[in-house]
Structure formats: structure tokens, C-alpha cells
């Protein structure tokens, strides 16, 4: 991801001197070719995964999709054209191709850094202003922000690169070389690097620190909430009052075995429900908001067959309850007329907070991986920019070339960061690479009334 002044077009960079040995040329060509292939393949996997797996179509992943588009441009055009430039020792494709390459490279680079800023601000506001911000956080709004980022990048760089020679009345770029004409002075290159790299990195690191602090505060609050529940967990007073079931109320003759099985079932169902929600949101970087809007007083009725028992005594059925019905309250609702609901409400609140905290930590982990890769790959070049401002000839040509390619390697690393930190991306990549992806193998499983969750069938 080329996010500041590319070393390839800096006046401090010279092309490979003629006379390089054939083995050196072969090594450079093979290495850069493999890097380009890996970059294109990885980012194409991101785009295809987003298309075929609906679980990945979340608001925050739209920003990753835009980032992958910029990286794909870098891997397809920038890497290969610069490799040609290095191996030939001069620019042989003409001035128009040079300006178009530079414009495309800079627009994609600036769009990349702006997408990183969007991701950082999105995570920051999601954590610090969960109610007000998430109400406005829609795919349409995310697409608008991404489009604006690309438009601003285009307006900032493309006209200046393409038309500067006409504004000043002449083209001063030396024959056989390719660089931006108005960046011919080191001090201008330095100012551009400060605005395009150091300032955004400072903002992103500050936002990440705030996100980390807020997440830690939530973890402490959750620990305190769970600690306050501990004394009430031994009584089990809510097990009979929260559910209406056969033999659960006022029937001392109920067989213990049957009652025990019935009482265990809702807990198993509830645990499955939470596990299923967590699996669904494994690939999502959004925070839990839907459960906040559930209407109090509502209940979920789960139909399940009763377990037959051989030594079963006749029991008295409670009024208005079918033998195979188990009722449990929704996350914020309570079973009408039930007793002991306060501990149950606290338990659900703790689970909801735990689930939200886990998702926030996953999102922060992905952001930290992308940000770390960006800093590690772009810092060496930008340090050289600072040095060259005060000492023009202090940076060897080889270091400029390595610093440049290290910048491009960031576009190769980004898809690996998505797969490393996001299980949904990782599983989808694996199925695509093994040619085992088949939409017909995906089945719909109801997660809660009115919602659908897609999970791969066992055949996958």
C-alpha cells in the first residue's frame, strides 16, 4: 500500500545502473514477480470472499474491501511498472505512461491511508459512542465515506501530476526518468511525507490507544459485574420460575429424572444460542446493537419433544401449558409473573457485555495488525526522506530501492492480516484456495425469530 511519496519517483532515487549481472536481474525479476503475484492473489481473495460470503458483508468490512482495491491496484500496476523501470535502467514507455502510472499510484496510495483513517475513526466512535454512532452506521453511509476518500485522493493528486507541466509551461523531468515534476525539491518531498505519513500515523496511533483504554475499562466493568453475580449463582432459584414446563410448579409427584432433563434443556438451548451468535459474528467487526432494542416482556417459546421415562408417575399439567413447550425470556424480557428474574437479568446482561467485549477485542486486533504492518513497512522509507532533506547524498541507492519495495510489501501483507485476525476471512480463503466453495452447500439456520444465519454444511 503506497501511502506517501513513493521512492520510485523521488529525485533522490536513481534506477539500477547498467551492467547489472544476469543473475542479479533474474533474482530481482523473480522476486518482484512473486511479490506482485502474491499481492494480486491475496487481494483478489478478499474481493471474492466479500462477494460469496454474506457473513463478511458488514459495515467495517466495506473499509477493508476498499483497502483491498487500492492494494490490488498497487500489485497489478505499480509493482510491475517499477520493476520494468529498474530492470531496464530507464523509463522507456513515454511521458504519458509515466504520468498516468504516477497518478494511479498516488491516488491509490492516498486512498489507502484515508481508508486506514476511516477504519480507525469507525472503531473509535463505535467504542466511545456506541448508541449515537451506531444508529448512523449503515452500509450506505460507509459507501459514501469510501467514495469521498477516493474522490479527495483523486482531486489532490491526479490533476497536479498530469497537468503541472502545462501550468508552469514546460516539462522539467529528465529524459528516460519518471518522477513527479513538482516534487523535484527535497523540502517539498519532506513536507509531503509529513502530511501523508507522519500526521496520519500519529492520529491512528492516538485513536488506537484510546480504543485500547476504553476496551480495558469495559473489561474491568464486566469483571465487576460478574463478581457481583457470584453470590447468587448457587441457589438456582430462577430455574423453575423462569420456565413453564410439566411438573415444574406445585407437583411434588413429578419424576426427578424427567424434571431434571427438562430443566437442563433451556440452558443447553441458551448456551447454543450464544455460541451460534458468536460464530456468526466471528467475521464481523461490528458491535452488538440489535439486542439492545428488544422489547421487554416478550418471550421466546421453544418447542421440543419430551423425553419418555419408563417409571413415570402421572403428573398434573399446569394450566395453559402444553407438554412439549419450554418458555424462556428474551435477553431483556422477563416471563410474566415469574420470580427470581433479577439474577437472570444480570446474567443475560453480563453475557451480552461479554459478547460485545469479545467482538470489540477482535476488531481492535485486526486494526492493530493492519496498523502495525503499515508502520513497519513505511517507516524506513520515510526516515530516509527525513535524512535526505538535510543530507542529499547520505542515503545509498540500494537502501532507497529496498525501502521502496518494503512499502509495496505492505500491500502483500494486508490480506494476511485479515486472515490472521478474522476467522471468517480465514475459512473463506481456505475454501476458495481448495476449490471447495459451493453456495449450494450453505444452509440457512435460524438464529432468532426474524433473522437468518448462514453456516457451511458439514460437507465443507
Swiss-Prot record:
Compositional bias ranges of the Basic residues kind: 328-343
Molecular functions (GO terms): G protein-coupled acetylcholine receptor activity
SS bond partners: 98-178
A Pfam family per the record: 7tm_1
Entry keyword annotation includes DNA repair: no
Residues with Phosphothreonine modification: 230, 428, 455
Transmembrane segments annotated in the record for this chain: 23-48, 63-84, 96-121, 143-164, 186-209, 367-390, 398-420
Ranges per topology, Extracellular: 1-22, 85-95, 165-185, 391-397
Database matches in SUPFAM superfamilies: Family A G protein-coupled receptor-like
PROSITE patterns: G_PROTEIN_RECEP_F1_1, G_PROTEIN_RECEP_F1_2
Region Disordered, residue ranges: 225-257, 274-297, 310-351
Cytoplasmic side: 49-62, 122-142, 210-366, 421-460
InterPro entries assigned: GPCR_Rhodpsn, GPCR_Rhodpsn_7TM, Musac_Ach_M1_rcpt, Musac_Ach_rcpt
Example GO biological process: G protein-coupled receptor signaling pathway, coupled to cyclic nucleotide second messenger
Quaternary data: Interacts with GPRASP2. Interacts with TMEM147.
Record-stated family: Belongs to the G-protein coupled receptor 1 family. Muscarinic acetylcholine receptor subfamily. CHRM1 sub-subfamily.
Function as written in the Swiss-Prot or TrEMBL entry: The muscarinic acetylcholine receptor mediates various cellular responses, including inhibition of adenylate cyclase, breakdown of phosphoinositides and modulation of potassium channels through the action of G proteins. Primary transducing effect is Pi turnover.
Name of the molecule in the record: Muscarinic acetylcholine receptor M1
Lineage: Eukaryota, Metazoa, Chordata, Craniata, Vertebrata
Amino acid at each position: 500500500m503506497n501511502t506517501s511519496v513513493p521512492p520510485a519517483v523521488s529525485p533522490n532515487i536513481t534506477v539500477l545502473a547498467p551492467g547489472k549481472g544476469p543473475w542479479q536481474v533474474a533474482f530481482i525479476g523473480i522476486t518482484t514477480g512473486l511479490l506482485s503475484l502474491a499481492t494480486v492473489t491475496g487481494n483478489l481473495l478478499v474481493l471474492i470472499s466479500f462477494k460469496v460470503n454474506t457473513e463478511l458483508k458488514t459495515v467495517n468490512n466495506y473499509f477493508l474491501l476498499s483497502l483491498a482495491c487500492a492494494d490490488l491496484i498497487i500489485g497489478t500496476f505499480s509493482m510491475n511498472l517499477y520493476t520494468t523501470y529498474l530492470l531496464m535502467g530507464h523509463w522507456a514507455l513515454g511521458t504519458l505512461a509515466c504520468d498516468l502510472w504516477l497518478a494511479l499510484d498516488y491516488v491509490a496510495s492516498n486512498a489507502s491511508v484515508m481508508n486506514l483513517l476511516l477504519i480507525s475513526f469507525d472503531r473509535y466512535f463505535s467504542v466511545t459512542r456506541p448508541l449515537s454512532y451506531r444508529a448512523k452506521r449503515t452500509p450506505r453511509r460507509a459507501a459514501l465515506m469510501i467514495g469521498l476518500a477516493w474522490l479527495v485522493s483523486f482531486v489532490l493528486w491526479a490533476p497536479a501530476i498530469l497537468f503541472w507541466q502545462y501550468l508552469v509551461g514546460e516539462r522539467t523531468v529528465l529524459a528516460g526518468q519518471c518522477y513527479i515534476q513538482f516534487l523535484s525539491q527535497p523540502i517539498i518531498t519532506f513536507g509531503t511525507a509529513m502530511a501523508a505519513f507522519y500526521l496520519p500515523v500519529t492520529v491512528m496511533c492516538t485513536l488506537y490507544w484510546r480504543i485500547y483504554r476504553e476496551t480495558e475499562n469495559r473489561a474491568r466493568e464486566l469483571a465487576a459485574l460478574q463478581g457481583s453475580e457470584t453470590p447468587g449463582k448457587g441457589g438456582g432459584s430462577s430455574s423453575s420460575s423462569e420456565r413453564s414446563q410439566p411438573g415444574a410448579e406445585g407437583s411434588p409427584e413429578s419424576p426427578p429424572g424427567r424434571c431434571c432433563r427438562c430443566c437442563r434443556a433451556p440452558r443447553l438451548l441458551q448456551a447454543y444460542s450464544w455460541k451460534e451468535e458468536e460464530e456468526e459474528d466471528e467475521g464481523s467487526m461490528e458491535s452488538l446493537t440489535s439486542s439492545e432494542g428488544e422489547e421487554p416482556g416478550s418471550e421466546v417459546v421453544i418447542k421440543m419433544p419430551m423425553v419418555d421415562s419408563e417409571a413415570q408417575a402421572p403428573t398434573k399439567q399446569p394450566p395453559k401449558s402444553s407438554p412439549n413447550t419450554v418458555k424462556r425470556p428474551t435477553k431483556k424480557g422477563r416471563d410474566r409473573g415469574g420470580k427470581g428474574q433479577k439474577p437472570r437479568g444480570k446474567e443475560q446482561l453480563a453475557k451480552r457485555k461479554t459478547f460485545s467485549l469479545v467482538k470489540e477485542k477482535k476488531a481492535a486486533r485486526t486494526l492493530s495488525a493492519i496498523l502495525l504492518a503499515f508502520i513497519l513497512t513505511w517507516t524506513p522509507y520515510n526516515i530516509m526522506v527525513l535524512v535526505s532533506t538535510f543530507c542529499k547524498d547520505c542515503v545509498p541507492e540500494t537502501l532507497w530501492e529496498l525501502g521502496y519495495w518494503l512499502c509495496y510489501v505492505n500491500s502483500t501483507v494486508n490480506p494476511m492480516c485479515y486472515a490472521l485476525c478474522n476467522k471468517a476471512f480465514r475459512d473463506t480463503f481456505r475454501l476458495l484456495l481448495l476449490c471447495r466453495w459451493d453456495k449450494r452447500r450453505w444452509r440457512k439456520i435460524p438464529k432468532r425469530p426474524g433473522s437468518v444465519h448462514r453456516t457451511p454444511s458439514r460437507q465443507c
